[in-house]
Amino acid sequence: MSVKIFNSLTKQKEIFKPIESGKVKLYVCGMTVYDYMHIGHGRSWIIFDMVVRYLRMRGYEVTFVRNITDIDDKIIKRAGENKESPAALAERFIQILHEDEKALRVLSPDQEPRATQYVPEIIKLIQKLLDNQYAYTGQNGDVFFDVRRFKDYGKLSHRHLDELQAGARVEVSDSKRDPLDFVLWKKAKPGEPKWDSPWGEGRPGWHIECSAMSSSILGQPFDIHGGGLDLKFPHHENEIAQSEAGEEKPFVKLWMHAGLLEINKEKMSKSLGNIISIREALKESDVEVLRYFLLSGHYRNPLSYSKENLENGRLALERFYLALRGLPVVNHEKTSSYTDRFYEAMDDDFNTPIAFALLFEMVREINRFRDNNQIEKAAVLAAELKCLGNIFGLLQYSPEQFLQGAKKEADVQEIKKLIDQRNEARAKKDWKTADQIRDQLTDLGVAIEDSSDGTSWRQE
């Protein structure tokens, strides 16, 4: 067994050798819980869900930790706007997170630490940084990390200090010695959550939370740290600096970064206002369509969210389920060369595009067996296909369930398309075409109602 993974730290694929043979300790940066999760977050969840499933299938004992940031400036701001406590807001969105996670078929982490549960460990790490002279107390009472004191700063993002811009998710403050210094502990402000510390009442900064939680649970160093590409700098860079300056030993062996989900060639993000929530996405597409789409590109590459790409995902899954339909269910007891080749693709930095191409080879082979009336061979290969599909969280329905749902989804898309065409005809005062399309919709059992708000429809 030889899995190769691209290490962002060394910028090359490496043969993965866990620190402890047969055991993998994995930490992935989780959510700041102040709003609904969007499908860009969903991509990162599903990518690392795939990594965990695959490593476990390959025989590794995986300890998967994903944190929750439940105290943060954004949480405090949103709670104030909503006139609720930060704790109540965070708890509400933690429940929503868990519901979305389940809806996406994402495996729950083995441990899910919350920042507020690890304040003593955070304070202990900050004290070590002060003792080692990597941190200082500013004039305003905040505690800052002294970036220029840490000589390896920039080794993950592969940039020199002089190239790095201040202000990129690093708060600007007159109390800093250097614009790149970042806050470890924030002095309490009136009405904000606070904890006692040697430096006065306050709360943790964002970056120090992950350093303290990951090392407290997994030890230091641990095997793999993952997250979205947008976290590489400054968040992950700062984690390395804090952890290695505080503990005086390496932090993480291997860094994995998931490519971003784009919409109209821009990163999907709340700041750009172009997000699609996980809940909205699941109203439009089945969970398996979403999972297939989000895993269809290599995890390190950007992926474009579009109706066309989602439709391609639906059609791909339809091919899988059509191949499985009508075959007897048999136990998956032995594997063929297909499984070996699947492992070969996935062992090469989780190359899902090649792995999916191989699954389609299996579909073609199943169909050939079926055409030649070799039903037993088709059924055996179908069982193997379902087993491999499980690594991606796919092929969990019966063929009848999925295909009936896909037909309904296709019908809805066709209805919406006809309504759009009718609205275009009405806008051009082409009443003949508009009436013809209305008749088509009536034949499909669809009643439409026009109003000043637009056209609504229902199936009769």
Curated annotation (Swiss-Prot):
The answer to whether the entry has keyword S-adenosyl-L-methionine is no
HAMAP family to which the protein is assigned, alphabetical: Cys_tRNA_synth
* Annotated S-S bridges: none
The record places the motif ('HIGH' region) at 31-41
Q: What is this protein called?
A: Cysteine--tRNA ligase
Q: Give the EC class as a word.
A: ligase
Q: Which cofactors, if any, are listed as required?
A: Zn(2+)
Cite the cofactor comment: Binds 1 zinc ion per subunit.
The EC number(s) attached to this protein equal 6.1.1.16
Q: Which residues bind ATP?
A: 270
User: Out of the domains of life, which is the source?
Assistant: Bacteria
Spell out the NCBIfam families in the cross-references: cysS
Any one GO BP annotation for this protein: cysteinyl-tRNA aminoacylation
Q: Where is this motif: 'KMSKS' region?
A: 267-271
Subunit details: Monomer.
What's any one GO cellular component for it? cytosol
Keyword annotations: Aminoacyl-tRNA synthetase, ATP-binding, Cytoplasm, Ligase, Metal-binding, Nucleotide-binding, Protein biosynthesis, Zinc
Positions contributing to Zn(2+) binding: 29, 210, 235, 239
Q: What is its main location?
A: cytoplasm
Q: Where in the cell is it found?
A: Cytoplasm
Q: Which family does it belong to?
A: Belongs to the class-I aminoacyl-tRNA synthetase family.
Q: Which GO terms describe its molecular function?
A: ATP binding; cysteine-tRNA ligase activity; zinc ion binding
